Swiss-Prot record:
Composition bias, Basic and acidic residues: 47-58
Protein name per its UniProtKB record: Eukaryotic translation initiation factor 3 subunit J
GO cellular component assignments: eukaryotic 43S preinitiation complex; eukaryotic 48S preinitiation complex; eukaryotic translation initiation factor 3 complex
Known function: Component of the eukaryotic translation initiation factor 3 (eIF-3) complex, which is involved in protein synthesis of a specialized repertoire of mRNAs and, together with other initiation factors, stimulates binding of mRNA and methionyl-tRNAi to the 40S ribosome. The eIF-3 complex specifically targets and initiates translation of a subset of mRNAs involved in cell proliferation.
Higher taxonomy: Eukaryota, Metazoa, Ecdysozoa, Arthropoda, Hexapoda
Length: 236
């Protein structure tokens, strides 16, 4: 009996095939999106790492209005100065002329000191304390320039004669001989120039003959600093 039941049970048992695992059609979507996001992040990083080009600052344009205003202001100042000078009395004009001359002389002295490397300007000639050859050259150049300012005076030739005599008193006979030779050379050159200028007919427009200053016999005289200006030939 029991065997019949087992047979019947076996016959009734139906073995059903195992259902295949269900496939999710959306599976893997998230992985693709993650990969895509990582690519985009890398691209953004590359863009950030690229150096940004700095634009050169634009050159400032010239202000034409300001330039014109400054020119107009300068013109007005010149006109005002001209009117002021026109209204001056003869005495005031003379004082103004002397004032401008003093300013010009101070400017010339400054340029002379700069040309000869003179750095100390306080105290004028008293500020000099020459010891070396170069320092004496600087001192001589400044002194020559100062003395030469008065060359137009009628008393200037006598002043130079007395000055040379007083300076040579402290020299030895050999040194005085050198000074004498240099003065004689200068005298000879001056005579030649004066004769050449006297022979020239007037009205031809040729320049006046001047004393030669290079490769001549008066280089020794010029070493004492007396070649400071081109027109210093009148010093002696």
């Amino acid at each position: 009996m029991a065997d019949d039941w087992e047979s019947a049970a076996d016959s009734e048992v139906v073995i059903r095939p195992t259902a295949a695992a269900s496939v999710n059609k959306w599976e893997g979507e998230d992985e693709d999106e993650d990969i895509k996001d990582s690519w985009e992040d890398e691209e953004e990083k590359k863009d950030e790492e690229k150096p940004t080009k700095t634009e050169a600052p634009a050159k400032p344009k010239p202000n034409k209005a300001l330039k014109a205003k400054l020119e107009q202001q300068a013109l007005l100042e010149e006109e005002a100065e001209a009117k002021r000078l026109a209204n001056l009395s003869p005495a005031e004009k003379l004082a103004e002329k002397l004032r401008l001359q003093k300013i010009q002389e101070a400017s010339d002295l400054k340029h002379a000191q700069e040309a000869f490397g003179v750095t100390s300007t306080c105290g004028g000639l008293d500020a000099f304390n020459p010891e070396t050859k170069e320092e004496f050259k600087e001192f001589g150049a400044t002194l020559s320039w100062k003395v030469g300012q008065f060359r137009e005076s009628e008393h200037f030739p006598q002043f130079v004669e007395d000055l040379v005599r007083s300076l040579c008193v402290n020299l030895s006979a050999a040194d005085i001989k050198k000074v004498k030779m240099n003065v004689e050379i200068l005298h000879s050159e001056k005579l030649k120039l004066e004769k050449a200028n006297a022979k020239k007919p007037a009205g031809k427009g040729k320049g006046k003959v001047t004393l030669r200053t290079e490769n001549d016999d008066i280089d020794g005289y010029q070493k004492y600093g007396n070649d400071f200006t081109e027109d210093y030939d009148d010093f002696m």
